[in-house]
């Protein structure tokens, strides 16, 4: 299936290592202050699936209301190989998407991204688009809590990357490095440890963001 931006340019699925094919989308402060927590059964799930499962838990428990934002696309070509199934063959982005998730927690507006990297020692800034960064800036100026849940897939490590740290490296990338050192994320971000319910207890990190905002 081919997706196009509003200007007609075809979407490059390989440009951003964090984003799988949209076909699939359509169909050092440890929170527990323990650097060696056991990782529970996270194999086989994408970061997005893990966050969605965690959001469902938070919603069912009346803790927070957080949802994945829908992808703004216009479908232009559909095949019907079977009566019971339709296959999207071509679609256009109606507009540039912003961030992956938003919601409300303890009266605070949350707006955040979910990103994965196979890098071991740093997180590449190419995982972000300029409009996503500017969207987070705008939300934060209005008092929103903005961040990115970062997963280092080779080590199964999760962190909350505060928006301010992202902004710092984003603004300096033309003069300096084009990635955020993992050591910096460990020092100034918040480590998340897998649990059972919720799978990713990221609101514990959000509590620390709120406390330090």
From Swiss-Prot:
This is Holliday junction resolvase RecU. The keyword Magnesium applies. It is found in: Cytoplasm. GO terms for cellular component: cytoplasm. It catalyses: Endonucleolytic cleavage at a junction such as a reciprocal single-stranded crossover between two homologous DNA duplexes (Holliday junction). Pfam families: RecU (PF03838). GO terms for biological process: chromosome segregation; DNA recombination; DNA repair. Its main location: cytoplasm. Mg(2+) binds at residues 98, 100, 113, 132. The gene is recU. The record marks 115 as: Transition state stabilizer. The keyword Signal does not apply. Its EC number is 3.1.21.10. One of its GO terms (molecular function) is magnesium ion binding. Endonuclease that resolves Holliday junction intermediates in genetic recombination. Cleaves mobile four-strand junctions by introducing symmetrical nicks in paired strands. Promotes annealing of linear ssDNA with homologous dsDNA. Required for DNA repair, homologous recombination and chromosome segregation. Binds 1 Mg(2+) ion per subunit. Keywords: Cytoplasm, DNA damage, DNA recombination, DNA repair, Endonuclease, Hydrolase, Magnesium, Metal-binding, Nuclease. Belongs to the RecU family. Its cofactor is Mg(2+). The lineage of its organism: Bacteria, Bacillati, Bacillota, Bacilli, Lactobacillales.
């Amino acid at each position: 299936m081919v997706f196009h931006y509003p200007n007609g340019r075809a979407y490059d699925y390989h440009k951003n290592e964090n984003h799988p094919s949209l076909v699939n989308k359509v169909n050092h402060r440890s929170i527990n202050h323990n650097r060696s927590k056991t990782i529970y059964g996270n194999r086989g799930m994408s970061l997005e699936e893990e966050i969605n499962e965690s959001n469902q838990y938070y919603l069912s428990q009346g803790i927070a209301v957080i949802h994945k934002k829908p992808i703004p696309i216009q479908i232009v070509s559909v095949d019907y190989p079977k009566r019971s199934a339709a296959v999207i063959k071509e679609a256009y982005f109606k507009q540039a998407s912003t961030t992956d998730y938003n919601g409300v927690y303890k009266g605070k507006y949350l707006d955040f991204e979910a990103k994965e990297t196979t890098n071991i020692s740093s997180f590449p800034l190419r995982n972000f688009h300029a409009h996503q960064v500017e969207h987070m800036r705008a939300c934060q100026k209005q008092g929103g809590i903005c961040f990115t849940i970062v997963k280092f897939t080779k080590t199964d490590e999760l962190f909350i990357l505060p928006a301010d740290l992202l902004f710092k490296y984003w603004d300096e990338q033309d003069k300096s490095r084009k990635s955020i050192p993992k050591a910096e994320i460990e020092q100034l971000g918040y480590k998340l440890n897998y649990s059972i319910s919720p799978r990713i207890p990221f609101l514990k990190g959000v509590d620390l963001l709120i406390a330090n905002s």
